[in-house]
From Swiss-Prot:
It comes from Mycobacteroides abscessus (strain ATCC 19977 / DSM 44196 / CCUG 20993 / CIP 104536 / JCM 13569 / NCTC 13031 / TMC 1543 / L948) (Mycobacterium abscessus). Catalyzes the formation of phosphatidylethanolamine (PtdEtn) from phosphatidylserine (PtdSer). Is synthesized initially as an inactive proenzyme. Formation of the active enzyme involves a self-maturation process in which the active site pyruvoyl group is generated from an internal serine residue via an autocatalytic post-translational modification. Two non-identical subunits are generated from the proenzyme in this reaction, and the pyruvate is formed at the N-terminus of the alpha chain, which is derived from the carboxyl end of the proenzyme. It catalyses: a 1,2-diacyl-sn-glycero-3-phospho-L-serine + H(+) = a 1,2-diacyl-sn-glycero-3-phosphoethanolamine + CO2. The active site is at residue 206. This is Phosphatidylserine decarboxylase proenzyme. Its EC number is 4.1.1.65. The gene is psd.
Length: 237
C-alpha cells in the first residue's frame, strides 16, 4: 500500500492523532460562509430523527452544502509577473472587452479571461496577482445565466482593481448568476493582497472575469479547465 512520503529519519505517527491528521489532510476545510447552511441541514436531520426521509434529506442537504462551500488549500506559482485563475471552473471566454464602467477607466477593450463556475466547482475566489487593491466596487444588476456573454454587463457584480508592484492594473470581477444571488468580497481599498489568497465567494453557480493589461501573454484557451490560485492565465508585460 502506498504511503505518504516522510523526511528521512522521521518515525511515522500512530494512534488517534495520526488518524485525525490523515482525515484533515484528505477532507478540505469549509468556508465560514457555508456553516449556517450546513447547520440548517443538520438541524433538519435532528428534527426528523424519527423520520428517515426527513433525516436523510437533512443529512443530504448538509453534505451538499459542505461540498459546495469546501475551501481546499492551494499553492500558487512562485514565478514573478504572472496572473493566476481567480476561481475554479471552465474558461468560457478569451476575448477583449471594456472593463466595468463603474471603475472609471478608459472605455477601451482589454484582454479578458472569463471562468464559469458550475455548482460542482469550488466557489471561493482567489487573488489573481499580488498588489494593492486600488478600487473595490459593487454594482447591483440582473441575474442572467452566468455563461451568457451579456452577463458581464447586465448582472450584479463586484469589481476589484489590483495594482502590481510594477504598476500594472489587473481587474477581477465576481459576477452573480442565475442561481447565485450573493456575492461576498472581503477585499477593501488599500489592502495589500497576496497572490492566491482567498478574498471572496459567490454562492451557487457564477462567473469570474479577469481583465489584463495590454501586452499580456495569455496562456489558456477557451474550454480549458482552470484551478483557482494555481492555473497561470497569463504573463504580464
Amino acid at each position: 500500500m502506498a504511503r505518504r512520503p516522510r523526511p528521512a529519519g522521521s518515525e511515522p505517527d500512530s494512534g488517534i492523532p495520526h488518524i485525525v491528521e490523515l482525515v484533515r489532510s484528505t477532507i478540505p476545510p469549509i468556508h465560514p460562509a457555508g456553516l449556517p447552511f450546513i447547520a440548517g441541514g443538520l438541524g433538519l436531520a435532528g428534527l426528523g430523527v424519527r423520520n428517515r426521509w426527513v433525516r436523510g434529506t437533512g443529512l443530504a442537504l448538509a453534505g451538499a452544502c459542505a461540498g459546495f462551500f469546501r475551501h481546499p488549500p492551494r499553492v500558487p506559482p512562485n514565478r514573478a509577473d504572472v496572473v493566476v485563475a481567480a476561481a475554479d471552473g471552465q474558461v468560457c471566454l478569451v476575448d477583449r472587452a471594456v472593463p466595468p464602467p463603474e471603475l472609471g477607466l478608459p472605455a477601451e477593450p482589454l484582454p479578458r479571461i472569463s471562468i464559469f463556475l458550475s455548482v460542482f466547482d469550488v466557489h471561493v475566489q482567489r487573488v489573481p496577482v499580488a498588489g494593492e487593491a486600488t478600487a473595490v466596487i459593487h454594482r447591483s444588476g440582473q441575474f442572467l445565466s452566468a455563461d451568457r456573454a451579456e452577463a458581464s454587463v447586465a448582472n450584479e457584480r463586484n469589481s476589484v482593481q489590483i495594482r502590481t508592484r510594477t504598476g500594472h492594473d489587473v481587474i477581477v470581477v465576481q459576477i452573480a448568476g442565475l442561481i447565485a444571488r450573493r456575492i461576498v468580497c472581503h477585499a477593501k481599498v488599500g489592502d495589500q493582497l497576496s497572490i492566491g489568497d482567498t478574498y471572496g465567494l459567490i454562492r451557487f453557480g457564477s462567473r469570474v472575469d479577469t481583465y489584463l493589461p495590454e501586452g499580456s501573454k495569455i496562456l489558456v484557451q477557451q474550454g480549458q479547465r482552470a484551478v483557482g490560485a494555481e492555473t497561470v492565465l497569463a504573463e504580464l508585460p
